[in-house]
Every structure is written in C-alpha cells, then in structure tokens.
C-alpha cells in the first residue's frame, strides 16, 4: 500500500498567471505533479512555456496563483516563500527541470562532474571517490564521454549540455 506522500502531488500549481505590464505571459494554469511523474511542456513560440516553467521552479514569482510543494512530511509550502538555498536543494534532490536554455539549469563555471555531484552532496554523499564515480556513471548513461568529467559545460555542445542537465 502506498503511503500518503506517494498519493499526494509533490507540486501543485493553482491558477498561475504572469503579466509583464499589459502583456500576458500565461494565465490560469493549474496542474498537479505526483512523485515519479514526468511532465513535458510543449507549445508554440511565445505561448508561455518558459514563463510557466520559471514559475514552477520558483525562479519567477507569479502575478497571481500559487505553487505549493508537498514535503516528505505531507506539509504543503509555497515554493516562492522558501529560501533560495532550500529551493535550490529541492530542485537538486526532489524536483528536476531540463531547461530549454542549458545555461539556466547548469553552473557553467564548474565542471560537469561538479554539476552532477552537487545533487549527490545535497543528498548527503561526501566521499570524493563516490562523487566522482557517480558522475562518471551518469555521464555514460547520457552518452557523454566520461573522460570529459572535468570539462566545464561551456565546452560541451548544446545537445550535450541538455543531456548533462538530466
């Protein structure tokens, strides 16, 4: 039998709207995302995909509506009221976003291995050898040569940067 956390959405967006002056970025979006669920946002250019994803990730505060995160204890908290540090940890451990522009999702000034290891460190892994081995393993899984573990993302092609975000 699944526990209450698995039955509850991990992220709830209700009536999200973002206005840029008189221009509508997006309006009235509501959705729920459950643990283990993968969601893709598709649409025409200028339809509000990036605006929506930026609100869902906490990078952009909505003009109206809310984004609630349900933590492991079942407590719902406003994603936009969380500290930047907590939100960053959350996005590295429990929620994942593959950004249209990889520079929005990667730390370009540090190595690919460090980008991968950051999530593991947030989850409590501390041994350098374990972090490095995990980074090499993940690079192989997304079909990036593990010999490039020390290269910075800016040295990768756009497609490789997209895969590195995964």
Q: Which sequence ranges carry the predicted segments?
A:
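ABC ATPase NBD coupling module
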Residues: 75-96, 122
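Conserved ABC ATPase signature
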Residues: 152-156, 160
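The feature captures the beta-strand-to-loop junction immediately N-terminal to the Walker
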Residues: 42-44
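Conserved ABC ATPase "signature" region
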Residues: 130-147
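Q-loop/switch helix immediately C-terminal to the Walker
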Residues: 101, 108-122
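Conserved ABC transporter NBD signature motif
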Residues: 65-78
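Helix-to-loop junction immediately C-terminal to a conserved catalytic motif
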Residues: 57
């Amino acid at each position: 039998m699944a526990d209450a956390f698995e039955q509850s959405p991990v992220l709830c967006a209700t009536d999200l709207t973002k206005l840029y002056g008189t221009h509508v970025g997006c309006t009235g979006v509501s959705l729920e995302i459950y643990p283990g669920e993968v969601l893709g946002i598709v649409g025409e250019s200028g339809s509000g995909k990036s605006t929506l994803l930026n609100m869902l990730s906490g990078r952009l505060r909505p003009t109206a509506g809310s984004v609630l995160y349900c933590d492991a204890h079942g407590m719902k908290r406003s994603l936009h009221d969380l500290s930047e540090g907590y939100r960053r940890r959350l996005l590295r451990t429990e929620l994942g976003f593959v950004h249209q522009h990889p520079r929005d999702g990667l730390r370009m000034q540090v190595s690919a291995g460090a980008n991968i290891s950051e999530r593991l460190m947030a989850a409590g892994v501390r041994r350098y050898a374990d972090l490095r081995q995990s980074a090499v393993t993940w690079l192989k899984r997304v079909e990036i040569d593990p010999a490039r573990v020390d290269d910075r993302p800016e040295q990768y092609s756009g497609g490789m940067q997209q895969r590195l975000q995964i």
